[in-house]
A protein has these predicted regions:
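Phosphate/diphosphate-binding loops
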Residues: 56-86, 167-178, 205-232
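Histidine/acidic-residue-rich catalytic or RNA/ligand-binding cores of hydrolases
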Residues: 45-47, 144-152, 201-208, 239-256, ...
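Glycine-enriched alpha-helix->loop->beta-strand junction motifs that scaffold or abut catalytic
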Residues: 78-82, 152, 184-192, 229-232, ...
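Active-site microenvironment of metallo-dependent hydrolases
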Residues: 11-27, 32, 228, 232, ...
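Non-cysteine beta-strand/loop elements that form the S-adenosyl-L-methionine
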Residues: 81-97, 189-199
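Long hydrophobic segments that form regular secondary structure
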Residues: 114-153, 272, 279-302
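Active-site-proximal loop/turn and secondary-structure-junction residues that shape catalytic pockets
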Residues: 39-40, 68, 140-142, 174-176, ...
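Divalent metal-binding segments
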Residues: 1-69, 74, 94-143, 167, ...
């Protein structure tokens, strides 16, 4: 169905859609976008057209990923910064195609395995030797186990330091257990997560609970445990699966459907490393005195600080905490509005 739709999309229609997406991102205060392209999800022409458009027009920077097994040379030729993104180890919970160790509660099936641990290892080895970040789409616990086993095999072969240096990236990583989290930390993997998934489908009566049962669903998207283990989190939307919504994404991470699983630590600071969105450091322009800056100006309804004493509320207006004020993201309240977006010193959006 996707291939048929793309085949009927003209170059002009594609450019109009891409331009609209870039414009909307700028309006939302987004200065950097990651495009997860690949032969199974889009096309080389789609990726190169988007990268060219982003270079030509004032708007967010776009960093491309090409999700094709072993295609390091193709990724470089297309201008991608990584060989990964939508490189599918499994599918999705909703379609019963995320690969699980135990069957789905509502179907008895175990999901789909699109790549083996050996294929993961071959891809990660090729990327590591080429100095390029690798990445995979992996949601289910069996798929994540295949990723960990594959990456660990490369670490055994090429050395742990070489693997860790590239911060290979895993999209979604929703069903990680304690052993998987420890492995992510050990191997230097970045978890590219979508908190809006939990907001949309988590909870005792959500789609995840229907598919997996309440116990497994409660353990999904363990943001707090990942942060405690030192695993870098890149917060994203997987748009158009969920909408581009920066502060809504942060709110969903902070106010997880399973209270002990979310993390207020996921809130950004003025120099949030996660703002790089999981890019390998070799592709990130580090800020410095006199360098063109990228930032957004926000109008929050109220600024709060996080209380240092866990016996009181997590959110407080008490300035004695010593924590810089951040927007009140309490569910149900208004989110900050973007007044201006600046990308590398150029204003790309100014609210009217």
């Amino acid at each position: 169905m996707r291939a048929a739709a793309l085949a009927h999309l003209s170059a002009g229609q594609r450019e109009a859609a891409q331009r609209a997406a870039l414009r909307r991102a700028a309006e939302l205060g987004i200065g950097s976008l990651h495009e997860c392209a690949g032969p199974a999800i889009s096309s080389p022409e789609d990726l190169t057209a988007l990268l060219a458009l982003a270079e030509q027009e004032q708007g967010p920077e776009v960093f491309g990923y090409w999700g094709e097994l072993g295609a390091v040379d193709t990724a470089r030729r297309l201008g991608a910064v990584g060989a990964g993104g939508d490189l599918f180890v499994d599918g999705a919970i909703g379609s019963h195609t995320a690969c699980l160790h135990s069957p789905y509660a509502d179907s008895g099936r175990g999901g789909a395995e699109y790549l083996t641990a050996e294929q993961v290892a071959d891809h990660v080895a090729a990327c590591t030797e080429a100095g390029m970040q690798a990445g995979f789409h992996a949601i289910g616990d069996a798929a994540l186990d295949a990723v960990v086993r594959g990456v660990r095999a490369v670490a055994d072969r090429l050395g742990l330091a070489a693997v860790r240096a590239l911060r290979h990236r895993v999209e979604h990583a929703e069903l990680l257990d304690a052993a998987g989290i420890a492995a992510f930390a050990e191997l230097g993997l970045t978890a590219s997560v979508q908190p809006a998934f939990d907001a949309a489908w988590g909870g005792a009566e959500g789609m995840y609970a229907t598919r997996l049962g309440a116990e497994r669903a409660r353990a999904m998207n363990p943001f707090a445990a990942l942060l405690r283990a030192g695993v870098p989190l890149a917060l994203g939307s997987d748009a158009p699966v969920t909408a581009l919504d920066p502060w809504g994404t942060v709110r969903a991470a902070a106010f997880h459907r399973t209270p002990s699983t979310g993390s207020r630590s996921a809130r950004p600071s003025p120099r949030t490393p996660g703002a790089a969105g999981g890019r390998w450091a070799g592709t990130t322009r580090a800020p410095g005195a006199g360098a063109p800056a990228s930032y957004a100006v926000w109008a929050p309804a109220e600024l709060l600080v996080q209380a240092p004493d866990q016996r009181v509320a997590n959110w407080s207006t008490d300035p004695r905490s010593g924590v810089p004020g951040l927007p009140d993201l309490t569910p149900g309240g208004p989110l900050p509005q973007c007044l201006a977006t600046v990308v590398r010193g150029r204003t790309v959006h100014m609210a009217g």
